[in-house]
Amino acid sequence: YICSPTTGLNHIDISNDEIKVISLKGDYAFLNSIRATPEHIFGLSIALLRNYHSAFLSKENRNWNRDEYRGEELQGSNVGIIGLGRIGKILVQYYNAFGSTVYYYDIDKEKEDDGAIRVDSMDNLINASDIVILSINYTPENDGIITKRELSLLDGKYFINTSRGEVLDECALLEYIQTGNYKGIALDVLSNEADGPALLDDLLAIEHKKNVIITPHIGGATFQSMRRTEERIVEKLKETLARKEA
């Protein structure tokens, strides 16, 4: 049995001949109570808007001139969410509470939320938004769905990816981070994380020059959420083994 306390599966090689997939199940009702990742996304958006990347003082940065760190507010901003899944729906609640107008785009036309405005294309969502949040599940169909063209629409905007690195054309992303006219970018995920993200060294070489925040896939890494998901997995495994023995 393979049990994984994650929402993504691209770290499990289910094509491996040694792994016999009998069934694949997600405990989505339980996951609705797990808030670590949406809280991280919300925190990243505030960090970008308020220029925390450069405003945190340290031994190396003693600049007390607040005018150089002047930022923006969530109140009155337009937030665009790509993917109205579990995390997307929670984010709608968070940003509404702070006075933002929330837009969303999802290929599933049945998904809706009274607190957000549906947009009919990804391009229109990006154009309508001040902050663009990528929050889709990774599937082979989503591989590289964000290309150089979509990235070019982010000029003058903030962008957050906590989905998976593989949903982006990362070569185009690196080029855009170096040359684009965006306001800020936050990345919690990169491709090939298990083997060491190939893009990481290049990003770290330039992130200090831009309003770019990189976190090591810590979206779900809180004591509370990890404890609850790990306990849930043990509980479900025990139930499965008990049924097999019966």
Residue ranges and their predicted role:
Residues 156-158, 163-246:
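Rossmann-like dinucleotide-binding domain for NAD(H)/NADP(H)
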Residues 1-56:
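Phosphate/diphosphate ligand-binding glycine-rich loop within oxidoreductases
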Residues 7, 130, 135-138, 163-164, ...:
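Short glycine-/small-residue-rich Rossmann-like dinucleotide-binding loops
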Residues 32-40, 44, 86, 224-236:
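Mid-domain beta-loop-alpha active-site segment that forms a flexible
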Residues 1, 16-22, 113-122, 209-212:
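Active-site regions of enzymes building and remodeling cell-envelope glycoconjugates
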Residues 67-156:
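Rossmann-like dinucleotide/phosphate-binding beta-alpha-beta segment
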Residues 1-4, 99-106, 185-188:
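Short, hydrophobic beta-strand segments that form beta-sheet elements in well-ordered domains
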